[in-house]
Structure formats: C-alpha cells, structure tokens
Amino acid sequence: MENSVLGQLFDLVAAFDKVGLRPIICGGLGIHLSLHGRRKELSSRTTNDIDLMLTNQQVLDSATRKTIAEIITGDLDYGVCKDGRYFMFEKGQQKLDILTQPVDGVEIDGFRAKLVKSRLHAYVTPEAVFIEEDLRKISLSELFPDNDGAKGLTVDVPSPTNLLILKLFAFNDRDSGSRQDGDKAHAHAFDIYIIVASANLGDYREGAEFLVRHGNSDIIQKARSIVKDKFSSADSAGWLRVLETSSFFPNLNIQQRRQKLIEAKARLVRWFS
C-alpha cells in the first residue's frame, strides 16, 4: 500500500481520536488493514482513496455529524469533488469517500443522506447494515512502528465476511447494467479474490455464525445470489474478471492461474452456502 494513503489514514484517525471517535475504513484500504500481518501470495490492490463508513449512531447525533464535517473540511482541509458533492472529497491526489449504513431519521435524497446541509453528505449503503458486527480493531502502531504519535491510535475495519458482502454488491453494480465500469469491476473482483485467498479458518467460522444469524436478511440472500450467479464456477463472470487482471499471478501460466481461481471459488461458495 502506498505511503501517501497510509499518511492520509494516520491524519484521519488522529483527528477522529481527538474527539473520541474511531473511524471504520472500508474499500481497498480496509482490506489491506484487515489482512495486515498475514502471509499473502498476492499484495492487496493499491489505492489512493479512503472509504469512510459512518455508523447509525454517528449519523443520528447532530453534534457528531457537525464534528465530522468540521474534521473533514476544516481540520483536514479536504475540498469537495465536483462529481460527488459533499460525499466525495479530495486534497491533492488524496480521495475521501463518505458512506453510511442505511439509516432513518435524517434527510435522504436518492442514495444521498444529507447530514450537514451543503457541507457533509454520505452515500447510503444498504449492504452495510451489519457492518458493526465482528469489527477488527487495528492499532496504528503496527503500521507506523517508528512513529511515537501512533501509540494509542486505533481504527476499525469490517470483518472479512462484511468486506466480502460489500465487494460482492460493488462488483455486481459495476459488472453490468447502467453503471457498468470494467476497470472498477476488475478491481472489486480482485479484492474478492484477495479476501478469500487470505482468510483463515477463524474468519470462515466467524462468517458461518454471522450468516446463520442473518440468513433471512434480504442483503444476505442477495449476496448469496451474486455468488451463485457470478462466482460459482471458474468460468463465471467474477473469476474471469480476476483472470483478466494484470497483477493476478503474472508469472504463472494460464492453467496454474485457473487453478488458483478454482481453489478460491470453492472457498467463496462454501463461505456463503
């Protein structure tokens, strides 16, 4: 992962910590943090943006909403992206996207939760409904061992199962239809491979319990449907997207790469069965 986005993360976590908040980080960076310290055959995808997920508790408290808006646009000096006003921010090459769990009690306009008028909105993410379950707490001192300022700073990342759910929905959104985007579909599929290939038995068992708890949820049923439709064989759309990715084991021949996909497919199907 590039040092620039890790530095961006440090500043965000430090600013949140000053007001007693701990951010939840999703997306490619969240995956990188979730798997930090694990032995991986492939490195997680590089990214220059941070996906910040706000919780119901943060969104429903007016003072907290205003505090987060001040941190982003004031303390950290992010500017608003023209193509994502008030929920996509930038500072130089750094990007910050604001997401939220589905929430009642604030103004919603389409996919947009209007948290602080003309200052902070958030992209409503229905598949994040269970995002606070089984969170992983990551110490920044593990990422910045030589930085004394990192001591005591922590960040939350979703569980591998919740990361998979987010990525399955994101892939499905970008693989076909009106929002089709080949580059983003490739990125989401690659992220799914990284999560599945790097997960351990504890992750799988935790996920199995999670899926039992929420098996009747429309979100879980949809996630299982995406796995069935787009990841249930090595020739399914999702795995073909991975195979097309230039960073997917470039030194292996096609048969060896397909074998990697077959193994990952079996893991993912078993995970959501």
What are these regions (language model features)?
Residues 1-273:
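Compositionally biased terminal segments of proteins
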